[in-house]
Amino acid sequence: MSGFGHYARTADELEREILKRGIAIGVDWDDPSRMRDLARRALSCTPACMMKLLRSPVRQDKLTGELFALSELMLQNMRESAEIGFETHGGPAWKAFGRALNEEFDAGVRPPEAGA
């Protein structure tokens, strides 16, 4: 299993950073409705939206943009590990946010197309 270690390590690192930003912006990991709202916003945030958040002088906006960027890395890590037959799992924040992202994606929310 050592060949899969970097996926688990990446998940741990992402979990820590997701948790820190979530706490800073007041995310309630135990509120499925609010998690889905956050996931919907993350999935529908265009590259321009992301840059606006990341460049914002408002701390809450900047942290939200960082959380959205981390969610993209989280999804990429899960997708890449799944392609080789390894399921990546993080901690409670990862699971809550990942579940909400998957539910919103299943409900039809899609990331904007590149260049859109």
Give the ranges of each region predicted by the language model.
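Short coil/turn linker and secondary-structure boundary residues
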Residues: 9, 27-30, 92
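Exposed, low-complexity/repetitive linear segments and helix-based recognition motifs
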Residues: 9-14, 25, 100-103
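Amphipathic alpha-helical interaction modules
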Residues: 17-78
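Intrinsically disordered, low-complexity linker/tail regions enriched in Pro/Ser/Thr
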Residues: 1-20
